[in-house]
């Protein structure tokens, strides 16, 4: 695993942990609605996808997994913009930056194969 892959894993874990923190925080506050569950599911989604991306036994579907992770991340950013942008704080903006950089790195890995081993 090269530096690019390590960066991708770190960014995915960072955004996953942010979503886990938000989900737990919302549950602890007793806030109802779907948001706590969505945050927790987002955590699970990031962890499962980034694990599947680099799991040796799933290498044959790595390209598809990479694209799914990119779309998943983009969808997360878009839905945040549509649902919660008016309630954004510094943590939200940091998380969106992490997610955008994650997408950029995944695109780099997809289109420049030599980066996969660098």
Whereabouts are the PLM-identified features?
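Membrane-interface extramembranous regions
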Residues: 1-118
């Amino acid at each position: 695993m090269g530096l690019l892959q390590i960066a991708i894993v770190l960014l995915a874990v960072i955004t996953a942990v942010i979503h886990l923190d938000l989900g737990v925080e919302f549950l602890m506050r007793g806030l109802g609605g779907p948001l706590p569950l969505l945050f927790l599911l987002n955590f699970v989604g990031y962890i499962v996808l980034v694990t599947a991306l680099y799991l040796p036994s799933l290498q044959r579907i790595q390209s598809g997994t990479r694209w799914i992770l990119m779309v998943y991340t983009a969808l997360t950013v878009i839905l945040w913009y549509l649902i919660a942008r008016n309630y954004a704080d510094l943590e939200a903006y940091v998380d969106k930056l992490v997610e955008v950089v994650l997408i950029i790195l995944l695109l780099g890995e997809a289109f420049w194969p030599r980066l996969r081993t660098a």
